[in-house]
């Protein structure tokens, strides 16, 4: 027997990367998250089934995990709880366990005051816009709740961590392949704080872990890929060969060279593309975004590799990768996707693929970066009410700035996760770039 409840509608909650906000404010309240879970259950598993739920280490994750568990079980679904787990690992487990869908509780690189939800389909990929619209429309309908005899049940999966680690380490064929490498890994006090050091140690590396002591409040605080200065100093100070800087949910990565040089997403893409040219099956196509450095595009062209550009966001990158039949894609923020292995950006896997090349090709970071010449890129943010800025005005601002910039380019865009207007300027002249930004800021204000 089904029991119905009344509910009001609240739409437009999905942003560029799922649902995100300040904890305690719409949409990140227990009440709304519970309702969203019920709506997702109706759309993605109307006949019942299993849902995988994982989270990062922020304090509010426990609260939202409980809310999701209750709402999904009340919707007649079995729930597999992973606890703190890297986003790409939740993606892998969702597909590996044949779940109907997965839910990631994380605000990625944001501080502990924020949290969010990312919903995955049965393949472990982020749901597309059509499904998001269906879920939002479902919010305005009466949810169906179950009586005791048709409720789901919640369990924890003790094998998930080992299965994910085996999957990642499967890129190597030899035991202890990294035994000659000394590596610093910064887990941002986030979701990979157990898995990353264990994985690297199991592969034979000499591991120095930092940012691996989460307390619920220190995720992304002065550490990880968003605050890279700490590990950039640590690597040369300890004479390490490499540094790996993950973000809070471990779906993105920056690397640090032995001299403390920071290697961002565009550089990692170049290295992986260069490595792929040794593979006769590589079709010489990769996907970046509108923000990808034009110097990378030119350097890849010199190697006979074509770069396609999507809108910002790893979901858009993946979509264009499918359309162009590209294996490799990513963003300068460190989201790197390799479809030979996973449809999710995976920081640890990306780092291991670079380390595998260093070991097996007997090469170095410097040699892998040879031939890459990036154009200086300057990024600015203007905090503003985005609802008052029309898309036409943003296009006008961008066109005007590009007219005033010779030998470079300007991008003006709305942030999908924060009330910010983001401006990117590529120019050899930093003073001119700053002037352009000040001009745009004055017009916005």
Regions found by a protein language model. Give the residues of each.
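N-terminal small/polar loop signature for handling phosphorylated ligands or for N-terminal nucleophile
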Residues: 38, 42, 50-115, 198-256
């Amino acid at each position: 027997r089904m029991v119905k409840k009344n509910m009001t509608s609240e739409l437009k909650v999905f942003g560029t990367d799922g649902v995100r906000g300040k904890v305690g404010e719409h949409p990140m309240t227990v009440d709304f998250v519970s309702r969203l879970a019920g709506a997702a259950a109706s759309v993605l598993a109307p006949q019942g089934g299993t849902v995988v739920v994982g989270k990062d280490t922020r304090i509010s994750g426990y609260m939202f995990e409980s809310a999701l568990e209750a709402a999904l079980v009340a919707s007649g679904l079995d729930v597999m709880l992973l606890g703190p787990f890297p986003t790409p690992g939740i993606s892998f487990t969702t597909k590996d366990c044949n779940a109907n869908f997965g839910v990631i509780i994380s605000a990625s690189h944001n501080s502990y005051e924020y949290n969010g939800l990312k919903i995955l389909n049965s393949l472990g990929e982020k749901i597309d816009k059509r499904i998001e619209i269906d879920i939002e429309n479902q919010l305005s309908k009466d949810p169906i709740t179950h009586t005791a005899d048709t409720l789901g049940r919640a369990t924890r999966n003790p094998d998930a961590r080992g299965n994910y680690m085996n999957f990642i380490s499967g890129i190597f064929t030899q035991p202890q392949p990294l035994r000659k490498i000394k590596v610093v890994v910064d887990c941002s006090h986030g979701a990979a704080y157990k898995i990353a050091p264990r994985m690297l140690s199991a592969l034979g590396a000499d591991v120095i872990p930092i940012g691996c002591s989460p307390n619920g409040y220190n995720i992304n605080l002065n550490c990880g890929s968003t605050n890279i200065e700490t590990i950039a100093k640590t690597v040369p100070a300890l004479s390490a060969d490499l540094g790996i800087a993950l973000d809070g949910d471990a779906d993105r990565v920056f690397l640090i060279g032995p001299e403390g040089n920071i290697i961002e997403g565009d550089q990692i893409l170049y290295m992986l593309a260069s490595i792929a040219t040794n593979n006769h099956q590589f079709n010489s196509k990769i996907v970046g975004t509108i923000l990808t450095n034009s110097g990378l595009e030119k350097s890849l062209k010199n190697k006979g590799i074509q770069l396609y550009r999507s809108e910002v966001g790893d979901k858009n990158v993946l979509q264009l990768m499918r359309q162009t039949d590209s294996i490799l894609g990513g963003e300068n923020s460190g989201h790197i996707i390799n479809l030979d292995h996973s449809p999710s950006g995976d920081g640890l896997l990306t780092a291991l693929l670079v380390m595998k090349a260093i070991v097996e090709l007997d090469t170095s970071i410097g040699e892998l970066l040879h031939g890459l010449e990036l154009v200086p890129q300057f990024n600015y943010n203007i905090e503003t009410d985005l609802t008052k800025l029309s898309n036409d005005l943003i296009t006008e601002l961008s066109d005007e700035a590009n007219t005033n910039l010779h030998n470079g380019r300007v991008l003006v865009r709305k942030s999908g996760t924060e009330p910010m207007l983001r401006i990117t300027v590529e120019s050899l002249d930093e003073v001119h770039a700053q002037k352009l930004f000040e001009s745009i800021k004055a017009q916005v204000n």
